[in-house]
Amino acid sequence: MKRGLIAAIGVVALLAGATACGSDDKADSGKKTGPDSYKGQTLTVWAMDGSTPPGWTKDLTAAFKKKTGATLKFQTQKWDGIQQKITTALSESTPPDVIEVGNTQTPAYAATGGLSDLSDLKAEIGGDWVEALNESSVFDGKQYAAPWYFANRVVIYNKKVWADAGITDTPKTRDEFFKDLDAIKKKGKAEPIYLPGQNWYFFDGLTIGQGADLVKKEGDKYVSNLSDPKVTAAMELYKKYQAYSKAPKDKDEATPQQAEVFAKGNVGAFIGMGWEAGTAIAANKKIESDIGYFTIPGETADKPEGVFLGGSNFAVAAGSKKQDLAKEFLKLSLSDQFEGQLAKENGVIPNKESLNSNLTGNGAAEAAAPAAAVGGTTPLIPEWAAVENAPNPIKSYMTAVLNGKSPADAAKAVEAEINKRLSQKS
């Protein structure tokens, strides 16, 4: 099956009584274009906290008013509880017109019938969207959202530790990376890399790099594919990286926070999101000048390692009375001007490779961007959400392999639990 972008959520039951802010303006009457064609109307957009920087929001709102005559109203949402809130809003008669949805949540919302088909818009403005970034917006062959912005993991390293080990450049291939870790290990003063045994999303990136699928279809249901040789190859790579680390084999990157471990100054590198460098700096201001970034290298210099892509799409609520006006918003917000401005102001990866120049000067974003085209996520099926619920059986698999169990035996030990979770009805 085709790999997709973050674990799709389970379709939760529609709960009455939840509050959803919608639009109360009159419906569009036919297709209209040009200044003032939608004069007097208001388009309501739900966007997540932190997604819309002030400059971008101000400029886009003004441009939207100038182009359409309509007013743009952003309503900021918190991540906590958002899946239920969106699901409820999409079931109501006056939903928000446009909604920012987590990229892997998109197929689940589309499956409920809550999102509009944007296939015509894709044909008009999405010809050069990065395929890997657009994948989560497609469900059953139709375009139900538009890719907005993304982020992925990079190698965050301590330049002083690397220089002390005689390393003069960042690695461009996986083998070069291992040689650098060997050099740091030989120097003996620092832990080459901090990698706990359950950094699940880094492992998922390795499976993507190996072309592996974590689930497969058997009849009309999905089952675990953890015993597949490609998954095994990814786990063997993870094991090789983890052997350079003193981190616990039964913990993830948040226990303890890996950036805080790195901040102590005696770790060569860790694999994380660019913003985690800020966590390290907050813990130890002195380390700021020693922090550098590079793309996680793949087998060859021309293709980075696979990465887990996180991000957001814009979707139009099927129940919105302003379908045409919503599409005008998407055309403008996803234009090169505003997609590029968002990338520059928020340091996020844009939906087109041609816009990556807007990341210049942002070391973490520059390191992340090259891998976006070869990125992916966990399976884009609603059933997947239950698999990642704690305790995640794949994390148990990882720890078992790192502690000496064969990948085949470790997979066999958890596949029944994975299959049980995949069979749960939302």
Feature locations, PLM:
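Glycine-centered hinge/linker elements that transmit conformational signals in sensory
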Residues: 181-182, 223-251
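Extracytoplasmic/periplasmic substrate-recognition and gating elements
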Residues: 62, 165, 232, 236, ...
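Conserved N-terminal structural module of periplasmic/extracytoplasmic solute-binding proteins
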Residues: 3-15, 22-106, 251, 285, ...
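Long, aromatic- and glycine/proline-rich binding clefts that accommodate carbohydrate-like moieties
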Residues: 132-136, 294-295, 343-390
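Conserved C-terminal helix/tail region of periplasmic/extracytoplasmic solute-binding proteins
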Residues: 42, 71, 163, 374-426
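Extracytoplasmic "Venus flytrap"/periplasmic binding protein-like
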Residues: 63-129, 138, 163-165, 172, ...
